[in-house]
Amino acid sequence: MELKSIKKLSLTVNTVILIMVFGLMFFFHLCNVTFLVYFSIPTSMIYVIGYCLIHKNKLNIYVWLVFSWLTFYMGVTTICLGYDYGFHLYCFSMIPTMFVTEYMSYKLNKRSLWAFNVSILIAFFYLICTGYVASFGPVYEVNSKTASAFFWIFNAMTVFGFLIFYSKYLIYSIIKSEEKLSEIAH
């Protein structure tokens, strides 16, 4: 696993997330959820900063920034809009992604990301956000079955797609490492 390939993957993921933030910002505008429109502005800046961190090889800082803000952003959107839009699903994807990233960090001889402890915090945060919605309902009532169905499917497909491709990348990297070790041993 080389730094170059991890940087390329990070740039791709960062670009996809940034595009999604702008798409969500437009959706929030259409639904008159003004708070989330404005909340998307600092969110987009986080991912612009991400490009600088990737460029400067500050991948540990980048990972912490993205994971913490993405988890926070999806928690806020869940509280604002409720379960029907599927934003809470992203918290689930953060947990296995944390462990995959822990492995990548190990392969690059970087510091531990404390995947286990962070995963517990993510689960706790998820329970707080979804518990709030279960107890009090969402902050905004957006009465659009079409929008909620679209976003539930879109968010579920995004989460599953990300998990599948991220896991595939990890397994591919592990296999390549094993093959290199096998070549060296023989």
Model-flagged regions — what are they?
Residues 155-169, 173:
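Hydrophobic alpha-helical membrane-associated segments
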Residues 16-20, 72, 121, 125, ...:
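Cleavable Sec-type N-terminal signal peptides
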Residues 46-47, 66-91, 95-98, 105-152:
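Hydrophobic transmembrane alpha-helices
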Residues 7, 33-37, 145, 149, ...:
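Hydrophobic, aromatic-rich alpha-helical transmembrane segments
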Residues 167, 171-174, 178, 182-185:
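Amphipathic, heptad-repeat alpha-helical coiled-coil "signal-transmission/dimerization" linkers
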Residues 33, 56-57, 83-84, 132-140, ...:
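Membrane-interface elements of multi-pass transporters and channels
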Residues 1-4:
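Short, Lys/Arg-rich, polar N-terminal cytosolic tail immediately upstream
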Residues 7-83, 91-98, 117:
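Hydrophobic transmembrane alpha-helices and their membrane-interface boundaries in multi-pass
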